Amino acid sequence: MSLFDWFAARRKDQFVGKVIQETEESDGLWGKCPECGQVVYRKDLLTNANVCSNCGHHSRINSEERIKLIVDQGSFIALDKNLAPIDPLGFKDRRAYADRLRESQASTGLKDGVTTGVCRVEEIPLALAVMDFRFMGGSMGSVVGEKITRLIEKATSKKLPLLIVCASGGARMQEGMLSLMQMAKISGALERHREANLLYMPLLTHPTTGGVTASFAMLGDLILAEPKALIGFAGRRVIEQTLREKLPENFQTAEYLLEHGFVDKIIPRTELRKTLGKLLRLHGFQKITIST
């Protein structure tokens, strides 16, 4: 294994989190919760939004499943569906960036790592962006930044509240500065949205790290999170080596950030739509007709 492969494997292991594993000879019908060890019927798990009914462990879900969970049925209208990334730097590490893109697109069915659109939540219009960690670790490249920026600008022009579901390892290194500049571009669009007196809520899911945490994930009027989500900038190991101190066991979890004032509310996945509806109504948003 090369040094690059070793670092890539360690980085992936840190962020992917625990998922429900199929039991032996289960034919995909049963799974085992990695948190409590409970054997669960996979159909029941899917019905419960991939949340263990025994211990409440939240396993990963993809962007399509997330959208179905949040929005009123049939209300989601996707935007910028055909916007796709290119390889502006001709970047190659142990594999070409163009090959990585093709592989992620084939395995996920997505053009890039975010889906954006307008929808309704409990009949209230909402601009929604959902990041998908399956696509190159949810990394933020120029297309992810452009789609989110365009969504924010539409939300501002249409006077819509905004929800961004974050799941990312950070900026996409294969695009260099073109990736890093998305942090400022999105932040600028969010400031114009704020100046229009509109509500922005990021939902931090596992994991939310790096340049995403350092920009739009922490700029919300209300910062929401899923239980036990990993949220941070640098990795735990790097911080401990820099400070030469042992960090608390729950460091960089949603619960730790809530306790220290960085997160406003932790929302179990099964209660998300209802809670979002309450928050939108609390901030004065009502049922209206929206157009794209």
Curated annotation (Swiss-Prot):
Coiled coil: none annotated. GO terms for molecular function: acetyl-CoA carboxylase activity; ATP binding; carboxyl- or carbamoyltransferase activity; zinc ion binding. Its main location: cytoplasm. Residues 29-292 form the CoA carboxyltransferase N-terminal domain. InterPro entries: AcCoA_carboxyl_beta, Acetyl_CoA_COase_Trfase_b_su, ClpP/crotonase-like_dom_sf, COA_CT_N, Znf-ACC. A zinc finger (C4-type) spans 33-55. It catalyses: N(6)-carboxybiotinyl-L-lysyl-[protein] + acetyl-CoA = N(6)-biotinyl-L-lysyl-[protein] + malonyl-CoA. It is an enzyme of class 2 (transferase). GO terms for cellular component: acetyl-CoA carboxylase complex. Zn(2+) binds at residues 33, 36, 52, 55. Binds 1 zinc ion per subunit. The keyword Transcription regulation does not apply. GO terms for biological process: fatty acid biosynthetic process; malonyl-CoA biosynthetic process. Pathway: Lipid metabolism; malonyl-CoA biosynthesis; malonyl-CoA from acetyl-CoA: step 1/1. SUPFAM superfamilies: ClpP/crotonase. Keywords: ATP-binding, Cytoplasm, Fatty acid biosynthesis, Fatty acid metabolism, Lipid biosynthesis, Lipid metabolism, Metal-binding, Nucleotide-binding, Transferase, Zinc, Zinc-finger. Its cofactor is Zn(2+). It is found in: Cytoplasm. Component of the acetyl coenzyme A carboxylase (ACC) complex. Biotin carboxylase (BC) catalyzes the carboxylation of biotin on its carrier protein (BCCP) and then the CO(2) group is transferred by the transcarboxylase to acetyl-CoA to form malonyl-CoA. Acetyl-CoA carboxylase is a heterohexamer composed of biotin carboxyl carrier protein (AccB), biotin carboxylase (AccC) and two subunits each of ACCase subunit alpha (AccA) and ACCase subunit beta (AccD). Belongs to the AccD/PCCB family. This is Acetyl-coenzyme A carboxylase carboxyl transferase subunit beta. It comes from Prochlorococcus marinus (strain SARG / CCMP1375 / SS120). The gene is accD.
